[in-house]
Amino acid sequence: MAAAAYVDHFAAECLVSMSSRAVVHEPREGPEPRPEGAAAAAPTLPRVDERRDGKDSASLFVVARILADLNQQAPAPAPAERREGAAARKARTPCRLPPAPPAPPPGPEPASPGQAGAPAAPPSPAWSEPEAALEQEPGPAGSGEPGLRQRGRRGRSRADLESPQRKHKCHYAGCEKVYGKSSHLKAHLRTHTGERPFACSWQECNKKFARSDELARHYRTHTGEKKFSCPICEKRFMRSDHLTKHARRHANFHPGMLQRRGGGSRTGSLSDYSRSDASSPTISPASSP
């Protein structure tokens, strides 16, 4: 900084000296009166002064031009100054927002309900909720009036998605079982309440059961009845699940063999050997074979 200030000061001195000496080169209007004693030396002195002044002014003029050219070239800014300048220009630059979308054209006016051949209603805008979207369906023939049906596209309840055959739900917390018959639901609810309404009527047997099929299986232990026979070896069993387990051990066994047999050798219903919550119709011990 000190060197630059010195150079500027020196250039200013040169320019001042050039401006002060410029009067010497201007022609004078008339000769000035000179003293009589200096008449002999007068012709030689002005020539020497003019030569010296010309050399000095020429050298000062060259130096001034060089310094002026140097001052016009600004020094390169430091990296930190460049970053600061870029940040300042970025801060001064106004933020440009994207252009706003054009407004939708106005739709046609809705026609009265009695007007025949009325144009369809314009589609709902993009920002409307899809749950409340209206779907058009053709009205009755000859009416000329479109029927509107409102249907939710997203939020559908679980009951709508379930099969209509399974509509009896368990109301206990944490239990999500659903049944197709109310009797099956009642039998399942006994697993929560602990109720056992089906008691064994055999002498000195006080066992009770929550389902009638369980009572029927138990009653066969008293009578010794074995109504389930194997279609291959004719071996008999009290329970159908015991028969199925035995029949699968045969090499030539096929599941259709148990389904074709009837009468006293039938396999029975699925509830006789399964642990499902479905309840079969009530069978009293007296009516069971």
Swiss-Prot record:
It comes from Mus musculus (Mouse). GO terms for cellular component: nucleus. Belongs to the Sp1 C2H2-type zinc-finger protein family. SMART domains: ZnF_C2H2. GO terms for molecular function: DNA binding; DNA-binding transcription activator activity, RNA polymerase II-specific; RNA polymerase II cis-regulatory region sequence-specific DNA binding; zinc ion binding. The gene is Klf13. The keyword DNA-binding applies. This is Krueppel-like factor 13. CDD domains: KLF13_N. Signal peptide: none annotated. The modification Phosphoserine is found at S269, S271, S280, S284, S288. Its main location: nucleus. A zinc finger (C2H2-type) spans 168-192, 198-222, 228-250.
